Amino acid sequence: VTMAAADPERYGHIMEEAHVSIAAFGGTFLMMVALTYFIDDRKDVDWFATLECRLRQCASIRGIEIAIVLAMIIAFSSFLPRHEAATFLFAGAAGLLTFLGVEILGHVLDSSRDARRMVRQGGLGAFLYLEMLDASFSFDGVIGAFALTRNLFLIAIGLGIGAMYVRSVTIMLVEMGTLSKFRYLEHGAFYSILLLALIMYAQSFMHIPEVVTGLVGVVLILLSLRSSLVHNRLHQRS
């Protein structure tokens, strides 16, 4: 914090040098989030039926998500110089272990026998999961923000406002039951997470404009919303 306040140029340079590890860690965590959603035999609604049916069928293969993510980490690290590839592999493994650690902690807390304690501990597990998810999204935003300003405090304020807005909208959608009204909206969100993970991986060795990163999510959400509206109209007619 002292360096960020006293020497923002140096701090920004250090952050930019760490972009490989940030991309690997955040991309791995987000990819595990997306794959865990799609590779689930309890999932009964498909947006892209052919792809999602095949992914759901893979749920019987134990640890398939981990294998896919490890394969992606190794594949993307092959595009990097040797010293950066080692950093990418280490950070990717750290992101994978972090996700598994949060998942294990959530299962341990949810297995409590005492109902009241289970609610409190389950809330803690969900809180930790959301914090890690939010951090993974923010990693990409921090690097992009240095193109606009070197002031860490302005970056923190901007990311904080964005996170608060997104969480407020999410809570509103849950309370209004919007996800149940729009059949494919959740799918659009997880496809956005999956593509963001791939973009973060790719950013480790090539430049991808921030506008592309933002538009990918917006387009997928809008497409899923459109598909949901079409489905609702067809369902009402029948």
Whereabouts are the PLM-identified features?
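Multi-pass alpha-helical transmembrane bundle typical of ion/small-solute transporters
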Residues: 1-238
